[in-house]
Swiss-Prot record:
<feature type="transmembrane region" description="Helical">
    <location>
        <begin position="45"/>
        <end position="65"/>
    </location>
</feature>
<comment type="function">
    <text>Chloride/bicarbonate exchanger.</text>
</comment>
<dbReference type="InterPro" id="IPR001902">
    <property type="entry name" value="SLC26A/SulP_fam"/>
</dbReference>
<dbReference type="GO" id="GO:1902358">
    <property type="term" value="P:sulfate transmembrane transport"/>
</dbReference>
<dbReference type="GO" id="GO:1902476">
    <property type="term" value="P:chloride transmembrane transport"/>
</dbReference>
<dbReference type="GO" id="GO:0015106">
    <property type="term" value="F:bicarbonate transmembrane transporter activity"/>
</dbReference>
<dbReference type="InterPro" id="IPR002645">
    <property type="entry name" value="STAS_dom"/>
</dbReference>
<dbReference type="GO" id="GO:0015297">
    <property type="term" value="F:antiporter activity"/>
</dbReference>
<dbReference type="Pfam" id="PF01740">
    <property type="entry name" value="STAS"/>
</dbReference>
<feature type="transmembrane region" description="Helical">
    <location>
        <begin position="75"/>
        <end position="91"/>
    </location>
</feature>
<comment type="similarity">
    <text>Belongs to the SLC26A/SulP transporter (TC 2.A.53) family.</text>
</comment>
<protein>
    <recommendedName>
        <fullName>Putative solute carrier family 26 member 10P</fullName>
    </recommendedName>
</protein>
<dbReference type="GO" id="GO:0015116">
    <property type="term" value="F:sulfate transmembrane transporter activity"/>
</dbReference>
<feature type="domain" description="STAS">
    <location>
        <begin position="406"/>
        <end position="541"/>
    </location>
</feature>
<feature type="transmembrane region" description="Helical">
    <location>
        <begin position="116"/>
        <end position="136"/>
    </location>
</feature>
<keyword id="KW-1133">Transmembrane helix</keyword>
<feature type="transmembrane region" description="Helical">
    <location>
        <begin position="352"/>
        <end position="372"/>
    </location>
</feature>
Amino acid sequence: MRLDLASLMSAPKSLGSAFKSWRLDKAPSPQHTFPSTSIPGMAFALLASVPPVFGLYTSFFPVLIYSLLGTGRHLSTGTFAILSLMTGSAVERLVPEPLVGNLSGIEKEQLDAQRVGVAAAVAFGSGALMLGMFVLQLGVLSTFLSEPVVKALTSGAALHVLLSQLPSLLGLSLPRQIGCFSLFKTLASLLTALPRSSPAELTISALSLALLVPVKELNVRFRDRLPTPIPGEVVLVLLASVLCFTSSVDTRYQVQIVGLLPGGFPQPLLPNLAELPRILADSLPIALVSFAVSASLASIHADKYSYTIDSNQEFLAHGASNLISSLFSCFPNSATLATTNLLVDAGGKTQLAGLFSCTVVLSVLLWLGPFFYYLPKAVLACINISSMRQVFCQMQELPQLWHISRVDFLLQVPGLCILSYPTPLYFGTRGQFRCNLEWHLGLGEGEKETSKPDGPMVAVAEPVRVVVLDFSGVTFADAAGAREVVQVRERLASRCRDARIRLLLAQCNALVQGTLTRVGLLDRVTPDQLFVSVQDAAAYALGSLLRGSSTRSGSQEALGCGK
């Protein structure tokens, strides 16, 4: 397929014209760029389970690359909490923390080197996948990224980020939980170890949040009156570093600190390609999440400032950012909501704002690194949590979303799956119908993972309790297709009952309903399993989940599975 070379060559030209249209008096000041890039970069590196300095690398190289290739004028790239958390899960799974206790200096360096290698391999894999999507011109996928879907993703991930940072806030050394129900496993281990919390780190965390939260509220409430936002992160870092240095809390109370940040840049190194098969299952969702967040954020600002973005070019820009930066030991990156808003508020109008922020990160890498030696890691955890403020605030929109569109609201309810079958159900598609249904129900072979039809092995993230079969796209069904529905019901009856899954049928037209009636399916179900619209079925399913009826009755009534 022919690549769009014109879009590649137009990026330097757009940067050149930006010098004429961008006024220097609107350049973002260091007090904006320093707290929005350097400090969160080090904080998000802890989420990715790599040393803090690699967060600075990830705040530098991807910004340079995206500035040359991206089409989002107001977009700021770099470290992102959700991607860092997903990367950290892969790193912890492939290079777990040893159970032998304290490690020696050499052992710690070897462990960090292995973890950095895995994180860089994940970035390389996700970048390669996005470049492949650019070649296939899959930018049309951005049209399916509705606002409720993106908010559902970020809201759920924000809860994972919050719980993952609580051990650092409390001074607890707990292994990171991975796999299904990791959120609840982390919460259980946290509550169990709560009596062992460090009073010193707990005090540092409380004071840090007491400073950060009010400052961020003041910046939001008085953003029109303040000439510049209050740099709460900068003040906090300076105060915490000075306090830790003068009182020696790191040695007296065993408070964990950032330590030495190596100066300069890492040597370019190709990630271990042997790790790619092991991290493919992690690279694909990271690539999709990276594009989803970046494309939606770019579209918001493009609509606000009346210009257009090229979705395929965004695949190229973010793919190149991840792939090339992985050669410098960077972990996966994408556009960031907080940094983008800060740079826009500071007057940034083009990607030159991102290049300006690179100079601030460069100064930290070359000269200012030693000043962060005594910075407590608990402070970075507090910055992580406070940076997700906007994501937590968007949960307040759930009641409004419920009144506007209950189906969009239910996108954020775990345990519910709405499965739409958009083709006629006849002898040629009945096998595909059965495979798709079994895969979405998680009833394939194996306990922990299942194989998607014509696809790789993927993990089942959330257990499905209620499935709504949307038959609005089934225009007709022949005898073979209708009998397949009956056979699927008989074949899955026991497994649905054991897995406690309920199946509901919605929006079936009169022709298809008549065919299903003639083959005997509708004689085996009660009217409360049939719904006129998907919205009615979803509302009924939500009530069942809230009442716990799916746990009590399983699937004994769903499509006659219990008969």
